[in-house]
């Protein structure tokens, strides 16, 4: 929660799904826009999912829009894959729900690879009507979004406009 529009102080709230890290009993956890790949794919999770959520929230506070505004779990996974690439094979092989989103193939050398199912294939298999959702950014990587997102808005201070080009944000985005 943003405590004051004039100050960058935030307050962490809503611990409704909080649990001891050794007793992860929930399967439906995290708000969709901030849901980690581990949770989406049905992997065992740890406090690392909180760092994912925090990163998504920090980016949203900076840009004013969510980074992964998925309209469904499939749409959420597809947005993450578009920006970050296909998860490692081990995550897909271990994830209980990964087969809902990915199909196994073989490359020309006989090695297994995984590919995100098309929206049509997913809809057909799941009996849903997935629809493309709004895309807020033309860029596909976080550094590109930070560089190209039109930050200036009405009544913005010059310091707020300059943050869009701040090198610390770009360094952080490249390391993430």
Q: What is each PLM-predicted segment?
A:
Residues 1-12:
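Conserved protein kinase catalytic/activation segment
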Residues 88-174:
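C-terminal lobe substrate-recognition/regulatory segment of protein kinase catalytic domains
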Residues 42-47, 68:
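Activation segment
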Residues 19, 38-43, 61:
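End-of-activation segment of Hanks-type protein kinase domains
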Residues 25-39:
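Conserved activation segment of eukaryotic-like protein kinases, specifically the C-terminal portion
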Residues 50:
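Conserved catalytic-loop aspartate of Hanks-type protein kinases
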């Amino acid at each position: 929660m943003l405590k004051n529009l004039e100050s960058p102080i935030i307050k962490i709230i809503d611990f409704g799904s909080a649990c001891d890290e050794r007793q992860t009993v929930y399967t439906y956890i995290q708000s969709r826009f901030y849901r980690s790949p581990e949770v989406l794919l049905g992997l065992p999770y740890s406090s690392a999912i909180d760092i994912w959520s925090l990163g998504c929230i920090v980016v949203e506070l900076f840009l004013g829009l969510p980074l992964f505004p998925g309209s469904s779990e499939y749409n959420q996974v597809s947005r993450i894959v578009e920006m970050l690439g296909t998860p490692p094979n081990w995550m897909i092989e271990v994830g209980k729900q990964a087969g809902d989103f990915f199909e196994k193939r073989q490359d020309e050398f006989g090695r297994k690879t995984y590919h995100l199912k098309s929206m049509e294939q997913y809809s057909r298999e799941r009996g849903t009507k997935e629809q493309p959702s709004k895309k807020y950014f033309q860029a596909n990587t976080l550094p590109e979004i930070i560089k190209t997102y039109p930050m200036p808005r009405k009544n913005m201070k010059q310091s707020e406009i300059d943050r869009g080009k701040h090198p610390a944000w770009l360094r952080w985005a490249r390391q993430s």
